[in-house]
Regions:
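Conserved strand-turn element in the central/C-terminal portion of the radical SAM core barrel
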Residues: 54, 286, 313-325, 338-363, ...
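Radical SAM [4Fe-4S] cluster-binding motif and immediate context
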Residues: 26, 176-349, 369
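Radical SAM enzyme core and accessory elements
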Residues: 1-8, 18-20, 40-45, 62-71, ...
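Hydrophobic/aromatic residues located in beta-strands of well-ordered beta-sheets
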Residues: 6, 46, 101-102, 251, ...
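Catalytic cores of alpha/beta
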Residues: 113-117, 294, 358-373
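Acidic, low-complexity intrinsically disordered segments
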Residues: 2-237
Length: 473
């Protein structure tokens, strides 16, 4: 089989379309890496269809596939896309000359029985990070043919055993490229102190996360495992320049924990300073992995914003989450780090979680009080959601089994209450959280002083963020 035409498909999300919280869509990172690698085959035509940014029905997906007539389709689906993906795959397999169907994505962690493969729906499913393993599979298909049993048996066995594939040599991955339309579709909604229309580019510099937060799951991560696998600083800086040539003028590192490998962060910042890089960037970091010297170097290297998981103002809840590693009490550690970022002029987005197991109303009030004290530029308040693969999922699976896990989403109204607060009151508390944070006179004045020029050039983002008012209903 030549496999000369490949369709890369991210199926439509069916849960978050009615969520009342502002959000934006990340690129389908794994598919973009596959696209970049496949484009190096001179005889292969690659098509990418992202139904997250262009939502279409299963019937429309089938029609698009019929128009392309690919030899192979890679279907990427998240936990809340599982049914859509299964419907598409089942329909494709009914065709007389069905293409090979390869499944990737977190939906396959939900219920890892082998029903789909045994019923010949998918020809193979790659758990974990498919960006390198896919090409071993692809080369076998091209060399041995679609009907070869050896590669099928191998990948069936890997799936049955729950084997997660990992990118062990990230420097060898090809750099993804983006069309102008894609760059427009994947615009982040974070306000940054950049006085021009921003064109966001996205990178994954490190893979893995050494921490063991109870709520963390591969379903919501971009990588797997605790083993850190960092790219070289030069390779990352090269990709930033690659993105800049495509029109990108600000980068976002999407690593699960950008600060986990502090030696890498230091080397990357030194590389960017040595190149006299003018590219501003942001990343998600942990408060217990930062010090003033590292933050100052990050600022010098172009860092304009950091996303920090504060999570809770209750020390008990933080310890229950298994986030506490530093001897200093968590709230005090947060106060110190946010003071440093203000001194250095680095913007901050703080993440909070309410509805934690056994959490009381008083502890949620402690979280709101800490948020008001930290004074981050923006906040995101999530509902506690035990996704598949997390320790929380295992602990509460008897409760979860009574509900449709594919419908769980951390921005959506919880399906069940694990806190000592009712679901109705949790929804009200989240609304109060945002109201009390946003409607302070000091917040409005400070925020607009810092970001007025940004909003002038990025009015679409301003209007997107105003969507938060839906929560106040």
């Amino acid at each position: 089989m030549e496999a000369s035409s490949v369709l890369l498909l991210r199926v439509s999300s069916v849960v978050d379309k009615d969520v009342d919280h502002p959000q934006f869509f990340d690129p389908p990172y794994a598919l973009k890496y596959l696209q970049a690698g496949l484009q190096k085959y001179p005889d292969v035509t690659v098509h990418l269809l992202d139904c997250w940014v262009h939502p279409i029905t299963v019937s429309d997906m089938l029609a698009r596939a019929e128009g392309i007539r690919p030899d192979l389709i890679v279907i990427s689906s998240s936990s809340f896309d599982a049914q859509v993906a299964n419907d598409f795959v089942a329909s494709m397999k009914q065709q007389q000359e069905a293409p090979l169907l390869i499944g990737i994505g977190q939906s396959h962690y939900l219920d890892r029985d082998v029903r789909n493969i045994h019923e010949k729906d998918y020809d193979a499913i790659l758990l974990g990070e498919p960006e390198q393993e896919f090409f071993r599979l692809f080369d076998q298909i091209r060399a041995r043919g679609a009907g070869d049993g050896e590669w099928r048996e191998h990948y069936l066995r890997c799936y049955e055993q729950g084997q997660r594939f990992a990118v062990e040599e990230p420097d060898r991955l090809s750099f993804p490229s983006y069309t102008p339309e894609e760059l427009e579709s994947y615009r982040s909604i974070f306000p940054v102190q950049v006085p021009k229309r921003v064109v966001w580019g996205y990178l994954i510099a490190t893979r893995g996360c050494p921490h063991g937060c109870v709520f963390c799951s591969e379903v919501m991560r971009v990588s797997i495992g605790r083993k850190m696998r960092s790219r070289s600083a030069a390779n990352v800086a090269d990709e930033m320049e690659h993105l800049e040539r495509q029109g990108v003028n600000i980068c976002s590192f999407q690593d699960d924990s950008f600060s986990a490998d502090q030696r890498f962060v230091k080397s990357l910042c030194e590389e960017l300073v040595a190149r006299d890089s003018k590219m501003p960037w942001m990343a998600r970091v942990r408060v217990d992995e930062l010090d003033y010297e590292l933050l100052a170097l990050m600022k010098q290297a172009g860092c304009v914003m950091l996303g920090l998981g504060v999570e809770s103002g209750s020390q008990r809840i933080i310890e229950q989450m298994q986030k506490q590693r530093h001897p200093k009490p968590w709230p005090d550690l947060c106060r110190q780090v946010f003071q440093w970022t203000r001194q250095l002029g680095i913007g901050t987005n703080a993440y909070y979680v309410i509805g934690n197991p056994t959490e009381t109303r008083e502890e949620i009030e402690q979280t709101i009080a800490l948020a008001l004290e930290l004074k981050s530029d923006t906040i995101q308040v999530h509902f506690y959601t035990p996704y598949p693969g997390s320790m929380a999922w295992e602990k509460h699976k008897d409760v979860i089994a009574q509900h449709d896990a594919t419908q769980m989403f951390h921005y959506a109204t919880p399906m069940f209450a694990l806190a000592d607060v009712s679901i109705e009151d949790l929804v009200k508390l989240r609304s109060q959280f945002y109201r009390r944070y946003i409607f302070r006179a000091s917040f409005g004045l400070t925020h607009m002083r810092k970001h007025a020029a940004f909003y002038w050039h990025n009015r679409d983002i301003f209007w997107s963020l105003l969507g938060i008012r839906k929560i106040f209903r």
